[in-house]
Amino acid sequence: MQELSEINGSIAAVIFKNDENGYAVVRIELDDGQLTTAVGCLPYIAPGEMISAEGSWTTHAQHGRQFKIEQCSRTLPTSPDAIYDYLAGGAVRGIGPATAALIVDKFGDRTLDVLEMQPEKLAQVKGISSNKARDISAGFKKQSGVRRLTEFLCSYGIQPIFALRMFKFYGSSAIEVVHENPYILASAHIGASFAEADSFALSLGIDGDSLNRVCAAVVFELIHNSGNGHCFIPREKLAAATSQLIGVSPELAHEAIDKLSETREIVCDTVAGLEACYLASLYDAETYTAERIKAMCASPAGKGVRVESLIARLERMGGIEYAPMQREAISLAAKSNILIITGGPGTGKTTILKAVLALYDELGLDTYLAAPTGRAAKRMSELCGMEASTIHRMLGAKMSEDGETVIFGKDEDDKLACDAVIIDECSMVDITLMSAILKALKPNCRMLLVGDADQLPSVGPGNVFSDMIRSGVVPTVHLTEIFRQKADSRIVRNAHMINRGEHPDFNENSGDFFRLRRLQGGSCVDTIVELCRRRLPENMKIPSYQIQVLSPSRKGETGTANLNKCLQAALNPPAEGKKEKPFGDVIFRTGDRVIQTKNNYDIVWKGKNGQSGTGVYNGDIGTITDIDTAEESVTVDYEDKTARYGFEMLGEIEHAWALTVHKSQGSEYRAVILALNPGVQMLLTRGVLYTAVTRAKELLIMVGDDSVAHRMIDNHKQSRRYSALRIRLADENS
């Protein structure tokens, strides 16, 4: 092992720094007066700081000899000259060289104490108001707190980004909080791996066989598996996974499960003869959902209507004739509190949805429309001619103060003011969200659930839509007939063939469905870029912003990560006047297409008509319109609203020229280019291909070897999800 070297000196200049991940390149004036370049984890570093660092000397191919810092201690400057350098170098927002000179002239070597302990005195300096003094002090305290926390966690190998998140949620008490519960680092809102949190905990002196450690591992396994779609884990599997994760005996894992069950952090229940272990929140969501749906199915609907005369009137008004299954759906909607409509593309789901809306209107019911994503809600609004919202917005979702859970404003104590609710793209709804919807409904509120059960299941836990259908308890209409206006679409025909396990002729390039191996002389990536940049805009008059590239995976040459880099370079290259912000291994640029990757219930947005609100949701796609380095913010235009992100929030957005198929769920695009990525085998399934094809409205082009598509059709393997909703609905557990 290479022996570490030590250097001591002061920061002479900051060449580069990224406050999101703490990485910095600095020039250090060593104690002997020499200047050297150093790189490493130095969050909020500024000129004038004193530093003592351990690391190793390396030679960079381009930048020459430099010192790679492994660990370090930093102290703030104490002399007036050094304090001036520190403040003038931009260490504290709101203080530039001129203001720094005035402050240091006034307070000398006491300046930093005044900033932290007596900020009101800053108002004695010309040009600094009381409000500005408070803002300056708050910024200084934040940076001091983050620096102390980061140095503490970095000394145990914890990345600076997690220190920044800890400080965001816990402020000045973050060190105390993480000492008390090291495993909070692995919670969803902080995001460190369990291995990192566990290593930190062991370094703090927690015993390897500590029951608290094993309990933390059990909870982690349940949380981790909920992210893979499971509502519960069989007890024996959970004990074995915990034992393997942290190297303890299965007996100790069972003891931890018992302890957690006693305190109801988890719930153990028997499901079809199997002992199932749930996170308490998922158990409550699943059991509530089952009981409420059974009650809706058992209770009679409210006042009726003469369905046949209504259907005849709707047919006359629309100049259409409903098919038998569509008539059945409308009749069922008239007499059911809850109804499911499922079918593939072109089977008339939208026609039924409009008819049911007319039915509810005839009954005098106030109806809300909602969908899981913003794009799906917008499409629903356009198709139905009335406002639809995201489910989260309808329920008034917001994040709890500790950042760990979602709180819904509409619930059992404050119901939605509607008599009926229609949910589209219901295959995307997980058990937690379905439970929240049901809790917000009045006792006699009706519910229509519309979706395609053959698409990919929800990202979150549960198999809600499929379980409800398979239970046989909920009235369900399966639409299978492809209607005349869609029958000529090869997108629709091929989608249904794929869903049945049949193999379309992908060499038949005609109509709205094409397959290209690659353009002559180029790779698959070159072909995709050329289609987006020139071929489709020029030859088919489809602008690039109406084209969506999809790939099964993030990884590989034709994965979304590489495709987005190539598409950004082609569609939005650097240019004079375009602003940029490096973040991690990507560069955000004005004009970039981006997608929100997690629900943010608190971010403020402004609407185009002057209205404002909070919340941008997973799957929302927009365009970067401004990057303000002074305010450290990025502005994203989401068509109907704009939202500003602080630089520390940029981990919530990604480039969106190319999306994974999973990310595209709930959306439709005028043109879809599907990269036949041969990479991750577990993602090459029939469901992924079917979902990708059904995203296209007017044109679908598959790029790559068609053998990949044929393999996907043959692979109908569906990962098992541990969910008991079907069993509970069908009363098979009694």
Language model features by range: what are they?
Residues 1-306:
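Accessory, non-ATPase domains that flank or precede helicase/AAA+ motor cores in DNA-metabolism machines
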Residues 48-50, 591, 619:
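Loop/turn positions that initiate beta-strands
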Residues 232, 327-330, 336-509:
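ASCE P-loop NTPase helicase motor core
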Residues 500, 618-734:
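C-terminal accessory regions
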Residues 349, 453-614, 625, 732:
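Conserved helicase motor core of P-loop NTPases
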